[in-house]
């Protein structure tokens, strides 16, 4: 018998995970609000529109990610009631109404200040085709902690379980 110990989802693609008590699964989409948002990485408006309209063409390099910008690991996002909250050390440093263009622009400028080597940052949203660019289909991710513990033993060092996930296709 398997037991799920913790539930996480990521409102912003490749930047953070939020712990929640329950998740809603949407048929043919995945976890509600999971990776609905992404910050683009030095893309012009034409390229942004192209990847929004062609989900299979999305690549991790087009988005801000911890893989390429580990300095963002200090930050986290929560999404609730149309507000995207940027947090550092569990403290909200900016709360953005995603329906307010001015507030979204302020958030993008804040993110750009955190990663000055990136010239242009835009927040994009797609709730029908979330930003699952690393998988060919819509997925739900699970972590088997015993597998990670075995991996730690083989490596002889601690491994952050948040970096791994198994995938279930829906």
Where are these regions (language model features)?
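Electropositive, beta-rich accessory/interaction domains or terminal extensions
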Residues: 1-170
